[in-house]
C-alpha cells in the first residue's frame, strides 16, 4: 500500500508509521509465507505533518508556539497553547479528507495515534509521550466526524504536555 494513497494533507509522517510500513515490506520480501498467512492487510491513514503546521497557523497559535519554544520558562505557555490547539479550526480541504476517511471505514473503531518526527524519529525515541485516542466511530457521519476531529486535536494538544516538552528540551528538540 502506498502512503500517498492514504495520506491526509501533505508532509512527512512520523517514525512509528514509517517503521511499521518498512517492517511490513521486509516481511513481505523476506518471509512471504509468513506475511501472507499471518499478517492482516494494512488499513491505515496518515495525517501529514503539514496538516499540523497549517492548523497551527490558521488557528492563530504559531506565533505563540514559537515564543514558547524560545522562552526560558517555556512550560508556563503550554496551557494556553494547549487550549488553542484544542479549539482551532481545520482547513475545509482537510475536513473533506477526514470525512472521506470516515466514510471509507464506516462505523469501525479508529485509533488516532501520534507518530511525529520529533517523538520517534531516528535517535529521538521517546514514544508514549503524546496521546493516542480511541474513537468508537459510531453514530451519524457528523457525530463520528466531531469525535474524530476532537481526537486529532487532543493528540495535537498532547505535544505541549509538560512531560513531552521536558523530554524534548532535554534532547534540544523544542
Would you name each region that the model predicts?
Residues 1-174:
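Nucleotide/phosphate-binding sheet-loop regions of phosphoryl- and nucleotidyl-transfer enzymes
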